[in-house]
């Protein structure tokens, strides 16, 4: 093996170890257990303990079948990292506004399986978030476009006239 090849192998190995070390820094269990990995940031992070949050996440594209909706994972991450940083969960008002094809990700098991012939990978996360007080609001216009009615959504999911209306009222 040439000297260049040996050097490249060593550099690749060091890079791989660095990536693994960075990934292992992510906390896997937080306020929303099993979802929303985050990293603890040491030191002063400008996080006043009396802070109150009102945050809306917006998702308009469904997750690929078999995967979890990334915007919903981001909502879980937001909760996990802020609760871990000392913010009381009752000071975090979180809403996920859903439009477009993403409505399927909050569909009932029967609806989702009928559409995709498999279980909804986002359902456990949606249930966990609703259980912790996160609101899910579906755009009524998108629901109508995709042929969904209120009975097609998981328990706890609300419907608004439109996604724009939901955002305007938040």
Predicted regions located by residue number:
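Acidic/histidine-rich, surface-exposed loop or edge segments in extracytoplasmic proteins
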Residues: 48-64, 106-110
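Sec-dependent signal peptide recognition
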Residues: 3-10
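Histidine-anchored nucleotide/phosphate-binding helix
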Residues: 68-87
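Second-shell loop/turn segments in exported
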Residues: 57-68, 94, 113-115, 156
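A cross-taxonomic marker for long C-terminal extensions/tails that follow the last structured domain
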Residues: 22-34, 112-113, 118-170
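Sec/Tat signal peptide C-region and signal peptidase I cleavage site
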Residues: 17-21
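Structural recognition of the beta-strand scaffold that forms the well-ordered cores
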Residues: 54-58, 94-98, 135-138
